[in-house]
Regions:
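Amide-donor transfer/coupling interface in amidating biosynthetic enzymes
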Residues: 1-10, 37-160
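Catalytic nucleophile loop
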Residues: 4-31
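Class I SAM-dependent methyltransferase SAM-binding "motif I" and its flanking Rossmann-like core
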Residues: 34
Length: 160
């Protein structure tokens, strides 16, 4: 939570993965489903064990959202390795992707002052062969570079 607070105070870009999206949601005042398998009616198997690197379920993505643009689609499949998930969405977060059982799979920050993308799956696993994972990381790196350049320019101006 301290890292999220520090990133927010400095308006640093955040890419929150798996436990990260859950932590982000709680930090923003939201709540979690504690056990998807027992608390979500007709839940998919979100905890894949040793096979978590394999794509295990589809997600539906909000049209024109960041993930839809990066995926170039409103549907894709993702890996899955979690038993908790977002329940009540935290302030200034907007869900943009869901599993077929209704579990939230991605959120974005609705405030323009800070880039935040949270995903419930693991784009860092198997990214070498996954175009969406590559697009997520490339976009995050671009945003971070732009933020860094803007921060350097602002610091240089303040030093004059």
């Amino acid at each position: 939570m301290m890292l999220l607070a520090a990133a927010e105070a400095r308006q640093l870009p955040v890419l929150a993965i798996c436990f990260g999206i859950q932590s982000l949601n709680v930090y923003r005042g939201g709540t979690l489903i504690q056990d998807v398998e027992t608390e979500v009616k007709d839940s998919l198997k979100h905890m894949q064990g040793d096979l978590f690197w394999r794509r295990s379920h589809s997600i539906n993505i909000t049209e024109d959202s960041l993930i839809a643009k990066l995926a170039e689609s409103t549907h894709t499949t993702v890996n899955s390795h979690h038993h908790q998930a977002i329940d009540i969405v935290g302030r200034d977060l907007e869900p943009i992707a869901w599993a077929p059982d209704g579990v939230i799979e991605a959120v974005v920050n609705t405030r323009a002052d800070q880039f935040i993308l949270g995903v419930q799956w693991h784009p860092e696993v198997g990214w070498q062969n996954d175009l969406l994972s590559q697009a997520i990381f490339n976009h995050f790196i671009t945003v971070a570079r732009e933020r860094s350049s803007a921060g350097v320019a602002a610091t240089a101006s303040a030093d004059r």
